[in-house]
Amino acid sequence: MRNDVHLGHKARKRFGQNFLNDPYIIDGIVSAINPRPGQNLVEIGPGLGAITEPVGREVDKFTVIELDRDLAERLRNHPELADKLTIHEGDAMRFDFTQLVKPNNKLRIFGNLPYNISTPLMFHLFEFHKDIQDMHFMLQKEVVNRLAAGPGSKAYGRLTVMAQYYCKVVPVLEVPPTAFVPPPKVDSAVVRLVPYEELPHPAKDLRLLERVCREGFNQRRKTVRNCYKALISAEVLEELGVNPSMRPENLTLQQFVAMANWLADNPQH
């Protein structure tokens, strides 16, 4: 049997499809999500329903977003799920999640995300952080390491800072390639992202925070003084509690925000 065919569906490379088929891992993911009736659950990329089916056994209604027309059609005709699902056929990267929000019922989003779009998709979802209760995603293990990293580590970068700006990041479980058909070439992991009710370190202008992150991590081996010399003087860095001789990869989220907020208050620079 071909190793890229699962339940009669051939995995499509352009959609980055790898189908989960390990019952032990599936149980672990569903337990982590802990779906309950009445919750506003949204699955991105339900695929062949490996997580969709067990979640469907716990709840009466939920929403799925699926780009692959054949898979969306399959779900519409699913004997157990058809009546429970609201199916949005299309690209989650362009989806306006505010249309799913209900009064006092924030979104609980989950999915086995295609690894080729996981980072831009998370940046898209962060825009809706006020409407989201939590997110559970299967990702490349390397991406989960980046999301959860601390300053000074190799995995620490722009994605880390922006994810931790919006969310508490909790790695949940590791998943070997053998849990999928076809097996990906990388290890995977499940992560829980819980958006803060109140941002712990709010930026006055997000574009400036993204800019200081981008400039810092593009030159992570330079000193902070050299990296930001066109933007912020060494004296101001000292005032902000930033040591000019350290490297950008050692700066905390709080320090990146302090620099961005200084730039927002001093726009002539």
Swiss-Prot record:
Coiled coil: none annotated. GO terms for molecular function: 16S rRNA (adenine(1518)-N(6)/adenine(1519)-N(6))-dimethyltransferase activity; RNA binding. One of its GO terms (cellular component) is cytosol. It holds the Pfam family RrnaAD. It is found in: Cytoplasm. The keyword rRNA processing applies. Keywords: Cytoplasm, Methyltransferase, RNA-binding, rRNA processing, S-adenosyl-L-methionine, Transferase. The keyword Plastid does not apply. It catalyses: adenosine(1518)/adenosine(1519) in 16S rRNA + 4 S-adenosyl-L-methionine = N(6)-dimethyladenosine(1518)/N(6)-dimethyladenosine(1519) in 16S rRNA + 4 S-adenosyl-L-homocysteine + 4 H(+). S-adenosyl-L-methionine binds at residues 18, 20, 45, 66, 91, 112. HAMAP family: 16SrRNA_methyltr_A. NCBIfam families: ksgA. Specifically dimethylates two adjacent adenosines (A1518 and A1519) in the loop of a conserved hairpin near the 3'-end of 16S rRNA in the 30S particle. May play a critical role in biogenesis of 30S subunits. Belongs to the class I-like SAM-binding methyltransferase superfamily. rRNA adenine N(6)-methyltransferase family. RsmA subfamily. PANTHER family: DIMETHYLADENOSINE TRANSFERASE, DIMETHYLADENOSINE TRANSFERASE-RELATED. This is Ribosomal RNA small subunit methyltransferase A.
